[in-house]
């Protein structure tokens, strides 16, 4: 009982599971509904661009909110925004879709930043290589079942059903968080620097080579997942296969998260550099193979699942370089800058994809993602051997 009621790796993993269930239930529904409302893959990309810009700008306000209202209330705000996301999506209007996607982006940022701060307060640096894969492994069920369950409800019971289930998971998250009554580590809170201008935080982040390296690795990882959860569903619908297959593909990629603890143990023996580089190279190769077999949907799906293996390895290990490198006294500021990889990995590729899709089909998306993975492998070569 103590393991689920006192701050530690299991408690933080359970919080992430409930958050993941709320988000994963809508994971495939969001791009499918956007495609149904807009009718073109390029228009879907443009919607993601606009939401990404707004979400990125909003995320820089989170340290100010944490300082003004404290971390606990900002976490609650993030969960409430997930509930708002579900309610707005249920309207099945373009305006509701756009605002829902923005609420999801800001809510996810609030939850991600505050949970990362709690993890750094309570988990020792040498234990991160075990606790982070454990968190991902715990969430495997959510990300495996959620996308398929959500799209099945969406197609069989109609709009509103998947959204209702997502909102219920968000309510459970709020109740569990209230039960835990988490507090900030007083020693760390006392050492935290005052909130500076966001531009000063960015300059401070960029001035630290290890933080730049950690951000790049996380960015490339998120580029793959952003592609995987957005464009393959559109591709499968274009091929006449349907939304259920898209849900199966998303769930199949996420079930691989069950292996995350194994990758954590592997990194404990070999270090981070080799498995991270291998994951990126393998993911890039799978994207290129998907491009070659573009007119064979089953082959494309299998290749993208193969690439998801590499992305799961990066999920298990990719956050560890940042968590080990960041200084305790500037965690809120640096965490906010670091997690911009999530918004930028959706925003920047979406801008590029919007241009490419004017001239090419979805093969251009797969090729671009593969090149990003190869580039990430080159950057990961600079990871210190002892990290």
What is each of the regions a protein language model found here?
Residues 30, 110-123, 313-326:
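Intracellular juxtamembrane helix-capping segments at the cytosolic ends
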Residues 162-179, 366-381:
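Symmetry-related core transmembrane helices of the 12-TM Major Facilitator Superfamily/SLC fold
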Residues 104-139:
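Cytoplasmic helix-loop-helix junction between adjacent transmembrane helices
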């Amino acid at each position: 009982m103590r393991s689920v009621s006192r701050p530690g790796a299991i408690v933080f993993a359970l919080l992430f599971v409930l958050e993941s269930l709320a988000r994963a239930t809508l994971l495939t529904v969001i791009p499918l509904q956007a495609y149904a409302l807009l009718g073109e893959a390029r228009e879907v990309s443009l919607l993601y661009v606009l939401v990404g810009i707004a979400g990125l700008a909003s995320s820089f306000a989170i340290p100010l909110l944490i300082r003004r209202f404290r971390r606990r209330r900002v976490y609650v705000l993030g969960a409430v925004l997930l509930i708002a996301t579900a309610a707005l999506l249920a309207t099945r209007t373009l305006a509701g879709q756009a605002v829902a996607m923005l609420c999801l982006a800001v809510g996810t940022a609030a939850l991600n930043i505050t949970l990362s701060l709690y993890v750094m307060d309570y988990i020792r640096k040498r234990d991160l290589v075990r606790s982070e894969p454990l968190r991902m492994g715990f969430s495997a069920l959510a990300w495996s079942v959620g996308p398929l369950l959500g799209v099945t409800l969406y197609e069989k019971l109609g709009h509103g059903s998947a959204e209702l289930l997502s909102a219920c998971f968000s309510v459970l998250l709020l109740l569990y968080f209230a039960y835990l009554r988490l507090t900030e580590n007083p020693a760390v809170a006392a050492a935290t620097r005052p909130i500076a201008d966001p531009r000063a935080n960015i300059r401070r982040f960029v001035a630290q080579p290890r933080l730049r390296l950690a951000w790049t690795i996380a960015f490339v990882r998120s580029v793959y997942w952003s592609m995987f959860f957005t464009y393959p569903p559109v591709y499968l619908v274009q091929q006449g296969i349907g939304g259920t297959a898209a849900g199966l593909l998303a769930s199949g990629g996420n079930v691989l998260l069950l292996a995350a603890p194994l990758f954590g143990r592997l990194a404990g023996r070999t270090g981070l550099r080799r498995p991270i580089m291998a994951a990126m190279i393998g993911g890039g190769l799978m994207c290129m193979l998907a491009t070659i077999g573009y007119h064979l949907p089953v082959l494309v799906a299998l290749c993208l699942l193969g690439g998801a293996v590499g992305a799961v390895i990066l999920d298990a290990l990719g956050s560890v370089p940042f968590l080990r490198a960041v200084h305790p006294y500037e965690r809120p500021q640096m965490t906010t800058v670091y997690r911009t990889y999530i918004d930028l990995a959706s925003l920047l590729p979406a801008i590029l994809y919007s241009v490419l899709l004017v001239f090419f089909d979805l093969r251009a998306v797969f090729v671009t993602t593969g090149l990003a993975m190869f580039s990430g492998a080159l950057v990961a070569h600079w990871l210190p051997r002892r990290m």
